[in-house]
Amino acid sequence: MRFDPRGEARTAGRAATTGVIPGDVALSVGNPRSPLPEGWTWCQLTDFARLETGHTPSRKHPEYWGGEVPWIGIRDATANHGRTILKTEQYTNHLGIENSSARILPANTVCLSRTASVGYVVVMGRPMATSQDFVNWVCGAEIDYRFLKYVLMAERDAFLRFASGTTHQTIYFPEVKAFHVALPAVHVQRRIVETLSALDDRIDLLRQTNATLESIAQALFKSWFIDFDPVRAKAEGREPEGMDAATAALFPGEFEQSALGLIPKGWRRSSLAALADLNVASWSARRAPTEVAYIDLAGVKANVFEPPQRYTFAAAPSRARRELRVGDTLVATVRPGNRSFGFIAETEPGLTGSTGFAVLSPKSASFAPFVYLCATRDENIDRLSALADGGAYPAVRPELVQGTECVLPAEPVLDSFHSFAFPLLHCVSVNAQHARSLAELRDTLLPRLISGKLRLPECQEQVQEAIA
């Protein structure tokens, strides 16, 4: 073993398999001895990176949990595939590490989920530990950890061939120890990484921008319609902040008593049923598009949409029936605590939602941002989650989503709020589409670059144009 990094590897004891299972791009169980471009070589991964696994400290000892050591579980990987992570859902501590087979691994360790949900890849952004559901590599000087990350990402489909098991697919250690990677010189690895990272960095920036835009819209909704800041300011003789005189004039300058406590004078206690219709547009056999672009419950989380699944209407899932239009709010009625909700700021022919969503369609276009931001407030999602019943599939009735309570302002206030909030939500949609386009380009270039079939000069101009 040529690579001798600091520390001794701890992995399961069985030796590497002597069989060969070729991957799709640049990874294989065993040496496939297939031809490679000049300057590229099939190398056993453990010659250049220390193989590690992880462990779960005992749940019977609560003192092992909570602390300063991030602990990567499957949910961290599925939520952050391909990314460098700094935070995890669960944390352990040095007591948990000392009393288990878990160990703290250094920043830039590359982690691959090997069981349950096979094939998810993350990189440690700081020293962390993982569960036993991962195999981890601490890379030496001859392999760039980011290059290894991209190799593993490119082989997502191949991992199912490397795995075995009926109930749960698992990649076992004899196969992992036999991993061979097609490697060029490290300076070539870094140039490839720089090209792919330029796309990923732009995608991450768009996601961060969208999170900021969404936060601004939520904060504005809370200020106007929950905390009543403009009304409070006027009642105290101050000018409302962050708005011009014409907008400020739309708000009353005093409060009145209601069943909800003090609310702005002239506003009223109501529900979203006053502003939005429920599940009003559905496809039927007589009125249906030839093809549908389908969004299911797994296809959106906290207004981040996956690309729609495309079917002919005849072949689409039976739940693919809700016609979606600009301004619609989607809120999952099944397991609402999973936060499968979103706002339709742009549409396309045949855009279709699952019948597992409550679809709130605004009665006026200017009501749309208010409906979305009210229905998807953390407090309301928590309310729906608490009301969900049923064993395997806890759910709420769609009417409970439409019945979300609100304090209803005068319509000119809703019009003004729309003028501020809708451009933010529309920009989120535009940015998300741009990010999806960049991801498609990355996924097209990835296998060709990582295998040496595409030379860098052939794609660098295309990448620069895409991220400009």
What are these regions (language model features)?
Residues 19, 23-34, 43-62, 70, ...:
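Sequence-specific dsDNA recognition surfaces
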Residues 2-4, 8-11, 15-55, 178, ...:
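Non-catalytic DNA-recognition/assembly elements of restriction-modification systems
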Residues 36, 74, 124, 139, ...:
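Hydrophobic residues in beta-strands and at strand termini
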Residues 115-118, 126-135, 150-197, 297, ...:
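Glycine-anchored helix-breaking recognition loops at helix->coil/strand junctions
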